[in-house]
UniProtKB/Swiss-Prot annotation:
Keywords: Cytoplasm, RNA-binding. CDD domains: SmpB. GO terms for molecular function: RNA binding. This is SsrA-binding protein. Belongs to the SmpB family. The gene is smpB. The keyword Cytoplasm applies. GO terms for cellular component: cytosol. Required for rescue of stalled ribosomes mediated by trans-translation. Binds to transfer-messenger RNA (tmRNA), required for stable association of tmRNA with ribosomes. tmRNA and SmpB together mimic tRNA shape, replacing the anticodon stem-loop with SmpB. tmRNA is encoded by the ssrA gene; the 2 termini fold to resemble tRNA(Ala) and it encodes a 'tag peptide', a short internal open reading frame. During trans-translation Ala-aminoacylated tmRNA acts like a tRNA, entering the A-site of stalled ribosomes, displacing the stalled mRNA. It comes from Oleidesulfovibrio alaskensis (strain ATCC BAA-1058 / DSM 17464 / G20). InterPro entries: SmpB, SsrA-bd_prot, SsrA-bd_prot_CS. It is found in: Cytoplasm.
Length: 155
């Protein structure tokens, strides 16, 4: 009897820095066009996209700055680790992203990378850069919440 594959998304990587640096406003799920060795490297968790962002050229969305390490067992045929990768989105989603990016101060950043039904998906978000005082305010708010949870646990 064969085991049924779980349809749940296995998290590959998460961009924690994006939530710290940006106020995330709107989220999208995008497929990503990859080579076979890139998928094998992702299964091994060898990816970094902390400084990456999404651009739109010729009605196509591309992720720039995502590093997928070369697959160790691939031999002499390897992928370029730092190449721009095409995102698979519907045309209306690309139009929405273009409209948001043309607004002043908004950018599109990757948030997390995961498997969904054995396909690699990338969650991207439209975000506005936080100012220093916004970051400090978030840290203060987090500390207050932590203290209230501690007090509740004590009593």
């Amino acid at each position: 009897m064969t085991k049924k594959k779980s349809s749940g998304g296995a998290l590959i990587a998460q961009n924690k820095k994006a939530r710290h640096l940006y106020e995330l406003l709107e989220f999208f799920e995008a497929g990503i066009a990859l080579a076979g060795t890139e998928v094998k490297s992702l299964r091994a968790g060898q990816v970094s996209f902390t400084d990456s962002y999404v651009t739109i050229h010729n009605n196509e969305a591309w992720i720039v700055g995502m590093h997928i390490a070369p697959y160790a067992n691939a031999g002499y045929v390897q992928h370029d680790p730092d190449r721009d990768r095409k995102l698979l989105l519907h045309a209306r989603e690309i139009d929405t992203l273009r409209a948001r990016v043309e607004q002043k101060g908004l950018t599109v950043v990757p948030v997390k990378l995961y498997f969904k039904n054995s396909r690699v998906k990338l969650e991207i978000a439209v975000g506005r850069g936080k100012k220093l005082h916004d970051k400090r305010q978030d840290i203060k708010q987090r500390d207050v919440e932590r203290e209230t949870r501690r007090e509740i646990m004590r009593h």
